[in-house]
Amino acid sequence: MNIQALLSEKVSQALIAAGAPADCEPQVRQSAKVQFGDYQANGVMAVAKKLGMAPRQLAEQVLSHLDLNGIANKVEIAGPGFINIFLDPAFLADNVNRALQSERLGVTKPQAQTIVVDYSAPNVAKEMHVGHLRSTIIGDASVRTLEFLGHKVIRANHVGDWGTQFGMLIAYLEKQQQENAGEMALADLEGFYREAKKHYDEDEAFAERARSYVVKLQGGDEYFLQMWRKLVDITMSQNQITYDRLNVTLTRDDVMGESLYNPMLPGIVADLKAKGLAVESEGATVVFLDEYKNKEGEPMGVIIQKKDGGYLYTTTDIACAKYRYETLHADRVLYYIDSRQHQHLMQAWTIVRKAGYVPDSVPLEHHMFGMMLGKDGKPFKTRAGGTVKLADLLDEALERARRLVAEKNPDMSADELENLAKVVGIGAVKYADLSKNRTTDYVFDWDNMLAFEGNTAPYMQYAYTRVLSVFRKAGIDENAMIDAPVVIAEDREAQLAARLLQFEETLSVVAREGTPHVMCAYLYDLAGLFSGFYEHCPILSAESEETRNSRLKLALLTAKTLKLGLDTLGIETVERM
């Protein structure tokens, strides 16, 4: 259930009954401190200002109309007109029971939408590197959350699979008599790419041949298309290994590369001209946007077709947005692309809106993210200053986790240790990123991410096993106490129960904002509250069987919430560490 939504509705009704306009905002928030209750309604001040009333006077009138019977056992006015709401222990107990009776832990489903999520987007003929990590795992956490809430999610892996580089690659492969690209490892292709680029830059005849190959490829010549497909297939089969290691949900079926939109580009340029949005300028086709100014203060020109007839990324992105609305029937489109692309996307979308390709009712959202930095505060590189390959990073994560878990579990079997190392190592890399606000740069630090203290994957995974250990120690099957009542008598029980029941609110924020760090913060807080509850409220040695069973049910809901929450982040758990 969503307590915040329930209280917002109740406070809104009371505000309207007290004379507020129908569109008033109750501004119900989770309280930052225990002494302010479980929730605060902060909307009274803004409404009082509109009505020309003293805020406390309006707050008193709101309280006289506010019906929270069976929800709150105490409501008070604080400061200039805040309303503090303390949830009734009986309400908490009842909803903990309800959550345990539901596979979804009581989480309701909103009205389902079709949501396209654009993420990962590696390039063909190159290995994935750390620059692809953030888009891949943040996007996947968003996808998992939206799917859990019941939306139809279309994963769109916008692979860089088109452009002049393919003429260059095919020409060089041909030169080396390596046409059978299907037998090559991707690492070889990287070497080929470097050599091809070198030839392209230094040998004009080679460059001319490469350019002619691009024309033939774009013209649909079967030989060149076959070579191109081989390059794409090798790349994506290698990338799939990385996706599987990262425990992300992308598959080959989710590839929607740049090439998909090629057939649309001539029509889009012609249409933008016909609508008077695009004009000829110095031989190129340009859209001038009043919303963006150049250095001279004039409308900025966005090129959509070059003088030589070639198209640009902007043209592809216009076609892409149009396709996602018209063909995929998206109600909402999320782009997990780094912050440096923001202006480029905004310009493309401005053209999309002006041309009427996507209505304003369909949000196009740039869920941008910052860079991954080394401890020196500079972009994360190898010691030699090169780009860190994602496969190498995951290998190192596994190796470090192996040493860590072997040290802590000398008696564990080799197979169990290997699985634990995988869960901890990959989880640590992902969680370190997901737990930071995506809009900021973050420092990659092995020691911090593999620590068993603080807001880290190992700590959260251990917290989960610690809750489960209560049931192992007691030798209790969770089904044995399913009918036992939950009784909330202690403050720590109430605090834990209230936080457990805020799971749906947390999911809603992640779904709306694309901010998985909010889920990480929630789970970390939950683990801390359980720790305090465990220390101060004896479970197995409780004074009565009723109290024992009630506390076991709180522990059970904690375990289930931690596991499900981590699952929405793509973080695996184990039952023993």
UniProtKB/Swiss-Prot annotation:
Catalytic activity: tRNA(Arg) + L-arginine + ATP = L-arginyl-tRNA(Arg) + AMP + diphosphate
UniProt short sequence motif 'HIGH' region, positions renumbered to this chain: 122-132
Enzyme Commission no: 6.1.1.19
Pfam families noted in UniProt: Arg_tRNA_synt_N (PF03485), DALR_1 (PF05746), tRNA-synt_1d (PF00750)
Cellular component GO terms, alphabetical: cytoplasm
An example molecular function term from Gene Ontology annotations: ATP binding
Keywords associated with the record: Aminoacyl-tRNA synthetase, ATP-binding, Cytoplasm, Ligase, Nucleotide-binding, Protein biosynthesis
Ligase as UniProt keyword: yes
Calcium is among the record's keywords: no
One of the protein's GO biological processes: arginyl-tRNA aminoacylation
PROSITE patterns listed in its UniProt record: AA_TRNA_LIGASE_I
The family this protein is said to belong to: Belongs to the class-I aminoacyl-tRNA synthetase family.
Subunit-structure text: Monomer.
The protein's name in its UniProt record: Arginine--tRNA ligase
Organism annotation: Klebsiella pneumoniae subsp. pneumoniae (strain ATCC 700721 / MGH 78578)
Phylogenetic lineage: Bacteria, Pseudomonadati, Pseudomonadota, Gammaproteobacteria, Enterobacterales
